[in-house]
């Protein structure tokens, strides 16, 4: 398993890798308050739905451990905790993992209504730590199920290997470790089933070139970086020779019918994959599945500031090709007067998705063309869907 860590945690202390400095520099920020966590998430120093939920949950655990709560009564303590969680929820509203983690933490503390303040605080901290621990186990299971499913359905080459394309960053840097979509790629590689991995640049924030390419090189996985606009040409010209069999992406939110919100550019890859007969797979923990939202039309899509599209920062490169991480420069990539539309996510319709791979197994559409998640999350399904 990768030794890359987006989050370093021990009780009372949280460090978060500043991913804006990658791939040239490793720097961890101390995050000890909800305000610092909010800024860390909103500024995208940490990103990826699972990692966002983990940072928000643990940041409040750290401030509770360090004595931030002055309330004494049970009711006041619970009110304080829930208020901080409501604040953190607004840091990245599209990511359903954050909402689910907050609901889980609220429910756990509410169970202890009437008990003393220390018991409630202790329960919160333990529940937040459980979210971190469970995420890693979940990712390893997603990797196993995804690799198994692809081995069964993908057309492997003479050597039994396949090539895949991934988008954005869904690896150790987006989770507690191993990753979701990139976790499947890691598992394919470890089993000797991977020929080659392609990753998109993922404009405008370049998570693919800055983060995924970095992880692939770090893991010594055979890989190639392409721009987002090269995917169609890649499929047309190299699908057969490189045996490109799947596009594997993560998800910030999967709704009940399977429509999936993910990093902007995901939808167009699904359309291209369909046209070229390439499997399109969403890798997501069940915590990313939103059973309360029926279709993608109900997903709130975050829009980000215009400068992310018209400007870019990076380390300077010398005439000899050396990178000087001590010197960064911000440059304009467009006329600064141009209007900009900059949605952070798009929604891929479920009919373009071949499988949603969770820690409980791969879910495929039934004969009616619809996804049914009841068998991978029976309790939540019964509670939320069975009542309707």
From Swiss-Prot:
Domain of life per record: Eukaryota
SUPFAM superfamilies attached to this UniProt entry: NagB/RpiA/CoA transferase-like
Recorded metabolic or biological pathway in which this protein acts: Amino-acid biosynthesis; L-methionine biosynthesis via salvage pathway; L-methionine from S-methyl-5-thio-alpha-D-ribose 1-phosphate: step 1/6
Positions of transmembrane segments: none
Localization (cell): Cytoplasm; Nucleus
Gene Ontology cellular component terms for the protein in this record: cytoplasm; nucleus
Site feature: Transition state stabilizer: 168
Pfam families xref list: IF-2B
GO biological process: L-methionine salvage from methylthioadenosine
One Gene Ontology term of the molecular function aspect: S-methyl-5-thioribose-1-phosphate isomerase activity
Enzyme Commission number(s) from the entry: 5.3.1.23
Keywords from the UniProt entry: Amino-acid biosynthesis, Cytoplasm, Isomerase, Methionine biosynthesis, Nucleus
Reaction catalysis annotation: 5-(methylsulfanyl)-alpha-D-ribose 1-phosphate = 5-(methylsulfanyl)-D-ribulose 1-phosphate
Primary enzyme class: isomerase
Gene3D superfamilies, per the entry: translation initiation factor eif-2b, domain 1, Translation initiation factor eif-2b, domain 2
Catalytic site positions: 252 (proton donor)
Family assignment from sequence similarity: Belongs to the eIF-2B alpha/beta/delta subunits family. MtnA subfamily.
Role according to the record: Catalyzes the interconversion of methylthioribose-1-phosphate (MTR-1-P) into methylthioribulose-1-phosphate (MTRu-1-P).
Name of the protein in question: Methylthioribose-1-phosphate isomerase
Organism in which the protein naturally occurs: Verticillium alfalfae (strain VaMs.102 / ATCC MYA-4576 / FGSC 10136)
Upper lineage: Eukaryota, Fungi, Dikarya, Ascomycota, Pezizomycotina
Gene transcribed to yield this protein: MRI1
